[in-house]
Every structure is written in structure tokens, then in C-alpha cells.
From Swiss-Prot:
Its EC number is 6.3.2.9. NCBIfam families: murD (TIGR01087). Pathway: Cell wall biogenesis; peptidoglycan biosynthesis. Belongs to the MurCDEF family. It is found in: Cytoplasm. This is UDP-N-acetylmuramoylalanine--D-glutamate ligase. PANTHER family: UDP-N-ACETYLMURAMOYLALANINE--D-GLUTAMATE LIGASE. GO terms for biological process: cell division; cell wall organization; peptidoglycan biosynthetic process; regulation of cell shape. Cell wall formation. Catalyzes the addition of glutamate to the nucleotide precursor UDP-N-acetylmuramoyl-L-alanine (UMA). SUPFAM superfamilies: MurCD N-terminal domain (SSF51984), MurD-like peptide ligases, catalytic domain (SSF53623), MurD-like peptide ligases, peptide-binding domain (SSF53244). One of its GO terms (molecular function) is tetrahydrofolylpolyglutamate synthase activity. It catalyses: UDP-N-acetyl-alpha-D-muramoyl-L-alanine + D-glutamate + ATP = UDP-N-acetyl-alpha-D-muramoyl-L-alanyl-D-glutamate + ADP + phosphate + H(+).
Length: 466
């Protein structure tokens, strides 16, 4: 845990008592603050009260004595409208911040030179965060990983000289971190997302840009420049004096890092040097993972990791569960769990990575469906449709892709396995990449992916892939 000493002797309101909120309560208390905790969910309030914290309906308290409101990132700050707790804080002149802001203040007070890598982007954040942490750990560093990837930042060990904090940040968390100052900031990409919370793509992109604009003066901004929003951000912060490393997987760069036929190449001053070859690394398959690997490599290089050891460390990366996770193999068939593919944009990356696909898709449908994937339909040998979206997806696939409505994973997995094994194809892939949310049949995408893995490994003759 990171004791938060910057509010010692003061009273702090904490609203939103999930994982990060509860961790904030503990960290503030450990640092000497008095904590008043609030939440719109009665069960969360009861849990925090059982942990020994004072709870209150923050609508009915005076805000004049609060030094700050620590807000969970899931609570609306601006759109569609500010949460009532935000309005109450602003009316009382109380600053509204998040748990990563508390971390930044502690780092500034106690270990300002401790390496801090912050990662954001519409897609690829978690994989890149895990990969940076893996590369730094394999290079012999003391590494703490957390943030949006799952472990609340204040639950990690405190910043200190030589300890590297690798932190995934959502746009909501960036909004709540005015003192953000990473040693290395990574912006992977920007595409329309979370506009219900940001209003416009312009505002969403501006929030993402804040992370790289906040890089310390001696630090490095790593920016994927294959979309207009990120490319413009890179130009703007470079003009402001920041050191920028541009990354592209779509075209060679005269100054920056590009990926050419699985080779990560750095160019500068007319010279080129190969950093690594990621061909054949299952956990980094696909162009999207090539971008993740290139950005992670750029961050590791900026922190002093030698180019000579990056190759072996990239190859040993195990990947993340539910993201192009290879879970089993039987004869000619590979089984891939991409349950995190919850929309067409994410599933496009999975379909682009294989040529002979037996595709399990469906769930709670997202706006736009799977029509944007039409160019990839020739890769699909057969589709197995599940959940609420099954009929809608069947209508899109009619006359273009052979399909069956399986209804459930329990029916889809053995059917896809049977057809793939009997196809005679040398590289058949049974791919779960639903292009849908999971909430019609599962608690979350993790539960859906876990069930897929269980069903695959229960099939006769399947060998788990470590």
C-alpha cells in the first residue's frame, strides 16, 4: 500500500467505493487523513463501514471541511452531466481528484525521480501495460503494475528510487489527475469511444493528449501515429518541446519506430536498426499487437533497457487472458479466446490475424453490429452465433457466410471444434471474438472467456497452450 501523506491531518471525501475507492480510503487513513466515504450503492457503503471507515450520505453533510473529493473513475465528471457529488464539491470550492493523482503527489514528495510509465489509448492499453511491465521485470527492475488494468494504484508498493511503476490509465483517470507527470507516457491510438462520458471525439482526444503532454521535461512521449488524432497530438507536444518517439505499423518512418513484416525497426538520421523480430510470437500476433510491442519496446529503450535483450524478453511474454489468448490445440485446430473483443473494432483485429476461422460471435449487441467486418467475411469458414445478437448477426451473414445459431457457448464450442477438425485445413482456428458485450449471458467478458476456456479444455484430445 502507498500511504497518502499529502492530506495528513485533513478530512477527505471519497466517493465511489469499488476497488480503487476502497484502496484510497485505506491509503488516506494510513497517511493520517480522516476519511468520509460515500457511494450511491448501499452494499458498497456497508462493506466500507465494515472495514472501519466513517460513511455518510454526502448529500447531507457540510463540504466546507473537506480538503478534497477523491472520485472513482466510473463516476461522471462532466458528461452526460456531472455527478451530484462533483457539483457539491465544486460549489464548496473543493478540488476533485482521483487515486492516481494521490499517487503522483506522493511520488513528487518522496521519490520524484522514480520511473513512472503511464499508458493510454482507445485500444491496446492493457496488453501494452503488461508488456512494458514484463520487459522491465525481465531486465531486472523492481516493477509495480496497476491502474486501469485491475490493481488499484494505491494498493501497490510506494515509489522509490529504482522501482518502476507501470500504470494503465483510462480517459476518466487522466481527467482526475492534474499533477500527472510520467517519465514515459504512451498514447497508442485514438478512435471514437466513451463519447457518452466525453461529449465529442475532440474532447476525448484532448484528454488522451494530456497524458503525453504531461511527460516530465527529461522524459519521453511514445505516440502511435496511425490515426489523425494521435498524429496531431504528437506534432503539437513536440512543438512544445517534448521528446517524442513516433510509432507506426502502417508505414515506414524516417524518424521513429515502424513495423515491417514483423520486424520492429528504429530509424534516425537516415540510419536504421532492427530492435526485434516478433514473427511467430503467438501472444503478439496481429497488427494491433505489433503496435503494442513497438510502443512497449520504445518505452523500455527510453528507460535504459538494452536492445540486445528485448528480443528474448518479447518472445517470453505470455500475453493477457481473453485477448487473443491461445487456450488449446487439437491436431490441426487452434482455439483462441478473444472474449475482450466486445465490439466490431476489437473483433476486426482478431479476424485479421487468422485465415481459416470458425468464428463464435454474439452476445449483447453493440451499435453498428458486425456489418463493418464485411471485408473479413471471406476468412470465416463458418460462424456460430450466440446470445441476443444471434438473429441480427444471422441477417448480416445471410448469403455471405455459412452460419448456425448455437444460442450458447456450450453448444457453439463443440460444434465449432467438430467442424474445424473435420475441415482438413492445416491452420484452422476456433475463435471466440464476440463483437458484443457479455451481459446477456455472463457477468462480464472475463466470465465469458473463462467459460470458453473450460469448454475447450474439456474437449477430448485438446492440449492446453501454456
Amino acid at each position: 500500500m502507498i500511504p497518502v501523506t499529502s492530506f495528513a491531518g485533513k478530512t477527505v471525501a471519497v466517493f465511489g467505493l469499488g476497488g480503487s475507492g476502497l484502496a484510497s480510503c485505506h491509503a488516506l487513513k494510513a497517511g493520517g487523513a480522516e476519511v468520509i466515504a460515500g457511494d450511491d450503492n448501499a452494499d458498497n457503503l456497508a462493506k466500507v463501514a465494515q472495514a472501519g471507515f466513517i460513511t455518510a450520505d454526502l448529500r447531507n453533510v457540510s463540504w466546507v471541511n473537506f480538503a478534497a473529493l477523491v472520485l472513482a473513475p466510473g463516476v461522471p465528471l462532466t458528461h452526460p452531466k456531472p455527478h451530484w457529488s462533483v457539483l457539491a464539491a465544486r460549489q464548496a470550492g473543493v478540488e476533485v481528484i482521483g487515486d492516481i493523482e494521490l499517487f503522483c503527489r506522493e511520488r513528487a514528495r518522496h521519490a520524484p525521480d522514480a520511473p513512472f510509465v503511464a499508458i493510454t489509448g482507445t485500444n491496446g492499453k492493457s496488453t501494452t501495460t503488461a508488456l512494458v511491465a514484463h520487459l522491465m521485470r525481465e531486465a531486472g527492475h523492481d516493477v509495480q503494475m496497476g491502474g486501469n488494468i485491475g490493481t488499484a494504484i494505491l494498493s501497490l508498493e510506494p515509489p522509490r528510487k529504482g522501482r518502476v511503476h507501470v500504470i494503465e490509465m483510462s480517459s476518466y483517470q487522466i481527467d482526475l489527475t492534474p499533477s500527472l507527470d510520467p517519465t514515459v507516457g504512451i498514447l497508442l491510438n485514438v478512435s471514437p469511444d466513451h463519447l457518452d462520458r466525453h461529449g465529442t471525439i475532440e474532447h476525448y482526444a484532448a484528454v488522451k493528449e494530456r497524458l503525453i503532454a504531461a511527460v516530465q521535461p527529461h522524459g519521453t512521449a511514445v505516440v502511435g501515429v496511425d490515426d489523425i488524432w494521435s498524429r496531431t497530438a504528437a506534432d503539437r507536444i513536440e512543438q512544445a518541446g517534448k521528446r517524442v518517439v513516433r510509432v507506426s505499423v502502417k508505414r515506414p518512418l524516417a524518424d521513429g519506430i515502424s513495423v515491417d513484416h514483423d520486424r520492429i525497426v528504429r530509424a534516425s538520421g537516415g540510419a536504421q536498426a532492427e530492435i526485434a523480430d516478433i514473427g511467430g510470437i503467438g501472444s503478439l500476433r496481429g497488427r494491433h499487437n505489433a503496435q503494442n510491442a513497438a510502443c512497449a519496446s520504445a518505452a523500455a529503450l527510453a528507460l535504459g533497457v538494452g536492445r540486445d535483450i528485448l528480443q528474448q524478453d518479447l518472445r517470453s511474454f505470455p500475453g493477457l487472458a481473453h485477448r487473443m489468448e491461445q487456450v488449446g490445440r487439437k491436431a490441426n485446430v487452434l482455439f483462441v479466446n478473444d472474449s475482450k473483443g466486445t465490439n466490431a473494432d476489437a473483433t476486426e483485429k482478431a479476424l485479421s490475424s487468422f485465415a481459416e476461422i470458425f468464428w463464435i460471435a454474439g452476445g449483447k449487441p453493440k451499435s453498428g453490429g458486425i456489418a463493418p467486418l464485411a471485408e473479413l467475411f471471406p476468412r470465416i469458414r463458418k460462424a456460430y452465433l450466440i446470445g441476443e445478437a444471434a438473429e441480427e448477426f444471422a441477417g448480416t451473414l445471410e448469403g455471405r457466410v455459412v452460419y448456425e445459431i448455437s444460442g450458447t457457448l456450450e453448444a457453439a464450442v463443440p460444434a465449432a471444434a467438430r467442424d474445424a477438425e473435420g475441415s482438413g485445413l492445416a491452420d484452422a482456428v476456433v475463435l471466440l471474438s464476440p463483437a458484443c458485450a457479455s451481459f446477456d449471458q455472463f457477468r462480464n467478458f472475463e466470465a465469458r472467456g473463462d467459460r470458453f476456456r473450460e469448454l475447450v479444455r474439456a474437449l477430448p484430445g485438446v492440449t492446453p497452450v501454456a
